[in-house]
Amino acid sequence: MIAFFPELYEDELAYSWFSRYYTKSGYLSLRYALDDLYVKRYVNPDTEFVNELRPEVKELVIKHCGMENLILGHTMFSSYGRFLPDAKKQEAYRALLDMNGNFNNLLAIPKNRRGTGRTLRYCPLCVKEDRKAYGETYWHRIHQIQGIQICGRHGCYLAESDVSMERKAAPGLWNAESVIPEKLEVRMCEEEKEATLAGYACRIFEGRMPFKSRVSVAEFLKYRLKRPYGSASGVSLCLERLYQDYREFYGNKNVMTETKMQKILLGKRWNFYDICQLSMFAGIPVEELAAIPDSIADEIKEPVFMQVSEELGLDYELVRSVGEAVLRRYEARERVQRRKRTFAWEKMDEELLPKVRETIALLQGDGMTRPQRVT
């Protein structure tokens, strides 16, 4: 029977909170604590999210801090869910609130790799501050963001603990204070750009989570990259030149592949670290990426699609959906020969406009047949 929970600290992982409860409660066995906390008897406590809690435990959590606050402020949802499309993000959030395991399939987590080869990390300087302020330290969310090796506040390298994040590891509730040593080595990062990126990403991670936006992260990135990397017509980006400059900017260190960048710009990939990396390269302020302004929704309309929309008197969104479908098919065909020659972006733009017109005409019908549905 659980009678109390300790104070929940700022940015503390829910796993850390339950671990401190276990340590302070004097259980004779881990199994007794797991039985009191969780619905499933043989559960392995999740280091990044929350396993299904017993009803009476959930009631205590609600009274203490609220399930919404626990999910938004004390799990890794801000990393894996921040840049998802609105509908998918909302579905994942509901699954997390219900403590339903299918959230793993909804979040932007590398397939079958959540926790693989990773351990809980800590910042030596944050540990010192925690011990001074609270008399103990705890596991911070901000130190567990995949791809970031540096504390965004102090600019020092994060240290690895012995606590595995593997989902198949032996069950445990490892309290940070009992795991992290008293004597700590501090290694400052001397790479200014790497430290700046860590601080940039951490500030976005800590920002308020938007659930409704008129502009997707892919649309926003393309909008901000269009001026320096747009093709002649403005429909597409010169991906090869963009990728080359991006690699040079980061010195080829921890950069994503060109294919992964393309998927992000097509709205098919939502990796938190890679998006932050591309955004910082593009010079986008933290505040704008954390909460993409709705005011630019009308500005991002593609000029070619606007032209077709006005000429044919059709809804812009219909024209855009058809045009993007044509673009994807064209790019897929040309990608096969990319290694053999330079991609002819301007030529592609010239060919796109008539193709979009032809496709829309077919969808509209000839007056005798019904218009086709666009999916």
At which residue positions do the language-model features occur?
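Basic, alpha-helical nucleic-acid-binding regions used in initiation and control of genome expression
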Residues: M1-T375
